[in-house]
Amino acid sequence: ELDIEHAAVVGGTVAVSDDVKNAVDTLLVANGGAVSLRWFGDDRYATAVDVAENGVDAGIAAFTYVGVATGENYPDALAGGVGAGVQGGVVALTATNALSGATQAMLEDHAATILYLDVFGGPAAVADVVRTAIAEALGW
């Protein structure tokens, strides 16, 4: 038996059905916990921002460290996410050739708090123009 009392389902109903969320809720309630939260956005970029915002609000992450990876493929975000987690930070996603609007807004909103930022992957994953846009969003 797992002693889990809280859970977050990441993604909207297209990505994770209500049936799955309901099954998670059933397990949580049976274990004396509360129903799960659903963290999601309009797309994968906004979902990553919602996960970051909610993780910080829950006290399990901080905006002092941000990792940025392409949202067009998963390996860089998956591998980089481990490092971001070790740092107590968050991961944001972007398109390869243009900084996603949701990520840009998050960076601008938290620029004063962000002390460290890593881009996961080379220029084929996150183009130089995006790296420049990230620096501009942070005022660096």
What are these model-derived regions, one by one?
Residues 1-140:
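Extracellular glycan-binding segments that recognize GlcNAc-based cell-wall polysaccharides
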